[in-house]
Amino acid sequence: MIDIHSHIVFDVDDGPKTLEESLSLIEESYRQGVRIIVSTSHRRKGMFETPEDIIFKNFSIVKHEAEKRFEHLQILYGGELYYTSDMLEKLKLKQIPTLNNTKFALIEFSMQTSWKDIHTALSNVLMLGITPVVAHIERYNALENQKERVKEIINMGCYTQINSSHILKQKLFNDKHKRFKKRARYFLEENLVHFVASDMHNLDVRPPFLAEAYKIICRDFGKERANQLFIENAQSILKNHYI
């Protein structure tokens, strides 16, 4: 499997704090069958502002150690880019990374971002010649039960990603992700999803659930669809090809 959304670099955002935590997280992902992980540390003005050179330095350490430790594993560079006008300028100047240096970039919004602002933001990124991969679409209130809006995003030329944790079965009680899980299922049933990724941050609260999610998609939507969502579509964009 291929994971295009992960927080595996230590001491740069709200992901791992140490190199050992990074490697433990990667080990769990590897155990689940992932062989390519794109590191997408947060870039968010006012919240995650680690200098680019530090992120890349720590990424390089993680990549070297992980690829040495785990056979046939590839760690690639990217970022989860929170949309602001400042981010757009940095993307234009190539000061922040796309996914594996391709024309595809992982773009994030706040849960409360309006539909108008999401639409405008994605249009602005597309005008740079960069295709947005919209991170965890199930988190945005403006898209809840709004298949026409998501179709419009896709028809503009964007791709969509949902988190593997939100594919899992709802807990009977106190499932704080219940709303996200319902939305993710809705988008899957409407065939509006291009990628499932882990968005893993740590082993305690936000671990990877790719193996479990893959089984559920196979069972409910078929193996062919599962392979597209977990492997084939990601292979395409990481080679800089459209899906």
Swiss-Prot record:
Q: Name one GO biological process term.
A: capsule polysaccharide biosynthetic process
From the UniProt record, list the reaction(s) this protein catalyses.
Answer: O-phospho-L-tyrosyl-[protein] + H2O = L-tyrosyl-[protein] + phosphate
Q: What is its EC number?
A: 3.1.3.48
> Which UniProt keywords are given for this protein, alphabetically ordered?
Capsule biogenesis/degradation, Exopolysaccharide synthesis, Hydrolase, Manganese, Protein phosphatase
Q: What does this protein do?
A: Dephosphorylates CpsD. Involved in the regulation of capsular polysaccharide biosynthesis.
Instruction: Say which family it is in.
Output: Belongs to the metallo-dependent hydrolases superfamily. CpsB/CapC family.
What InterPro entries does the record point to?
Answer: Caps_polysacc_synth_CpsB, Caps_polysacc_synth_CpsB/CapC, Metal_Hydrolase
Q: Which NCBIfam families match?
A: caps_synth_Cps4B (NF041488)
Q: What's a Pfam family in this record?
A: CpsB_CapC
Q: Identify a single GO molecular function assigned to this protein.
A: manganese ion binding
Protein name (record):
Tyrosine-protein phosphatase CpsB
Q: Its annotated pathway?
A: Capsule biogenesis; capsule polysaccharide biosynthesis
Coiled coil region boundaries = none
Q: Note whether GTP-binding occurs among the keywords.
A: no
- Gene name linked to the record: cpsB
Required cofactor names = Mn(2+)
Q: What is the lineage of its organism?
A: Bacteria, Bacillati, Bacillota, Bacilli, Lactobacillales
Which species is this record about?
Streptococcus agalactiae serotype V (strain ATCC BAA-611 / 2603 V/R)
